Structure formats: structure tokens, C-alpha cells
């Protein structure tokens, strides 16, 4: 390492080069996390329901978690989204428009015992899924 009176430029350049050894720095600067994200960095996304699927819970739990396979409108990517609430999947039909958000797992991954599911449904045809499950709102007729 340079230590002299006029060493600032060399020190700056060395720091700049060394930062690229940090993987999180490289991914952030190159925008790789946003590029790999189906929602493209947005907090929520809209999509069309393709099918209803049941995902088996991981051990030691034994359940079939009700999910839907959706195609995002903004980029055409397909993702699986969890339907939270008792009987929530009954309010969702194929070709409905749903709003999804991240499920909140660590490092952007899956949460709890639902493997490979990184999103959850929040609204169906612009009506809150939670309100429909409670019974406060009805699903709008199209």
C-alpha cells in the first residue's frame, strides 16, 4: 500500500477495485437483484390466474397449502402465490386479476413450511382478499 504524500489516487483506486470482491456490492451496482426479481423491484404486482395448485408443506408439517399459479402482466413471468386465509382459494377463479406481494421470507425467499413460494395474494379484481375471507366484502361480478 502506498503511504506517501501523493498516494491518494493509488489508495482510491485500490479501494475501488477491492469493493468488487464483495458480492453484495457487485450485485447492487450491476442491478442483478432487480433483474432476477419477477416484480422488477416493485413492492406489488398484478397478474392473471392460470391455475390453482396445492403445495405440500415441508416436514414435520403435513398439509396442502392452497396456492395459485399466476402470470405477471408487466413482464409475462409465471410465479406461484400463496392464498392466506381459511377458504381464500374459493374466492379466486382462473383468469381473475390478482395483486401479489412478497411473502416476507428471509433474503427474499420462501416463508415457513411452503417451499418455493415467494409471493402471497392480497387482492382479487381490486378487492381485498382478507375482507372477502372475513365476509365484509363480496367479490365483484365482471
From Swiss-Prot:
Classification lineage: Archaea, Methanobacteriati, Methanobacteriota, Stenosarchaea group, Methanomicrobia
Single Gene Ontology MF annotation: structural constituent of ribosome
Family annotation (SUPFAM superfamilies): Nucleic acid-binding proteins
The species this protein was found in: Methanosarcina barkeri (strain Fusaro / DSM 804)
Recorded GO CC terms: small ribosomal subunit
CDD domains, per the entry: Ribosomal_S23
Keyword presence, Hydrolase: no
NCBIfam families listed in its UniProt record: PRK04211.1, uS12_E_A
Name this protein carries in UniProt: Small ribosomal subunit protein uS12
Quaternary assembly: Part of the 30S ribosomal subunit.
Alphabetically ordered keywords of this record: Ribonucleoprotein, Ribosomal protein, RNA-binding, rRNA-binding
Domain of life of the native organism: Archaea
GO biological process: translation
Its job: With S4 and S5 plays an important role in translational accuracy. Located at the interface of the 30S and 50S subunits.
HAMAP family reported for this sequence: Ribosomal_uS12_A (MF_00403_A)
Gene3D superfamilies in the cross-refs: Nucleic acid-binding proteins
Family statement drawn from the similarity comment of this UniProt entry: Belongs to the universal ribosomal protein uS12 family.
This protein's record includes keyword Electron transport: no
PROSITE patterns: RIBOSOMAL_S12
Amino acid at each position: 500500500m502506498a503511504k506517501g504524500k501523493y498516494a491518494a489516487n493509488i489508495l482510491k483506486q485500490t479501494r475501488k477495485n477491492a469493493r468488487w470482491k464483495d458480492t453484495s456490492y457487485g450485485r447492487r451496482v450491476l442491478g442483478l437483484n432487480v433483474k432476477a426479481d419477477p416484480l422488477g423491484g416493485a413492492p406489488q404486482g398484478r397478474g392473471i390466474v392460470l391455475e390453482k395448485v396445492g403445495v405440500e408443506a415441508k416436514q414435520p408439517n403435513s398439509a396442502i397449502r392452497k396456492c395459485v399459479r399466476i402470470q405477471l402482466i408487466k413482464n409475462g413471468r409465471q410465479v406461484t402465490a400463496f392464498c392466506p386465509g381459511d377458504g381464500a382459494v374459493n374466492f379466486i377463479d382462473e383468469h381473475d386479476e390478482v395483486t401479489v406481494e412478497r411473502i416476507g421470507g428471509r433474503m427474499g425467499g420462501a416463508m415457513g413450511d411452503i417451499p418455493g413460494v415467494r409471493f402471497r395474494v392480497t387482492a382479487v379484481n381490486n378487492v381485498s382478499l382478507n375482507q372477502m375471507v372475513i365476509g365484509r366484502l363480496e367479490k365483484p361480478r365482471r
